[in-house]
Amino acid sequence: MRSYTSAVDVATRRRASVRVAGPDARDHLQRLVSNDVDALQVGDACPALLLTAKARVIAPVVVWRRGEEDFLVLTEPELGETVRSLLVRMRLRAKCEIEPEEHESVLVFGGDVGFATDFPDAREALDAGLQPTVSDEELEARRVAAGVPRWGREIDDRVLPAEAGLEETHISFTKGCYPGQEPVARLHYRGHANRALRVLRLPAVPAYDAELVHDGKVVGRVTSAVPADGGALALAYVRTEVPDDAELAVG
């Protein structure tokens, strides 16, 4: 592996990785994930989702095309076996190998190393030999400020992609079929989500799952929060009918 010696900011990212390789690897992934794997050139990557038939999130992933027939699927550490077993179960007659791999992953802010990932203004690099300059706490603060949803906080098997703001980054509306495509497209073209993920500034750090109240009604819940400028920045799901500039009280 090539070793990089300079970067603006580097943060450790804990990952599980699954290799999918073989003559049918591209088609196999294209049939299962929400983004357009066919469009990836060698060296490119895209964030995507594995969804249930009802468009609930099974796992957020990043698909990296390492070679013509060699792909790496990256996900959260606790979801590695879930992703691997799903890819194996749905392989049917597809000619591809599906095996876990171990890598050290970092997020690189401001550099051009690595590949595109699901974190704004950052790229992801594997086994690059870079030393972290950003603590876990600072990375979490950057995540919340950027409105990036995280598995186990903003994303789980009850969440729709549109609610978490993942349509623009994780979904292609021009590719072929994949599990969950119909409800995703129906909501996108004909309806709207009842709640949406927002970044909020609050006077103090609230507890996880704290209620948000507007005009005497509970309109949302806090999913993540970090200290910021004497107060807090928080991610929360809020009812879409609540104006963006509405004052929300923590219940």
PLM features: what roles do these ranges have?
Residues M1-I58, G67-E68:
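Acidic, proline/glycine-enriched N-terminal capping motif
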Residues V61, V159, A164-I171, Q181, ...:
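Glycine-rich, small/acidic residue-mixed loop/short-helix segments
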Residues D24-L29, G80-R84, L126-P132, P206-A210, ...:
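Short, conserved charged micro-motifs
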Residues Q30-D38, L79-E81, S85-R93, Y189, ...:
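Short, intrinsically disordered, mixed-charge
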Residues D9-V10, R14-R19, V62-R150:
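Acidic, low-complexity central loop/insert segments
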Residues P132-H188:
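Aromatic-anchored, glycine/proline-accented short structural segments
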Residues M1-T5, A48-P60, L92, D112-V113, ...:
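Short amphipathic beta-strand starts and helix->beta connectors
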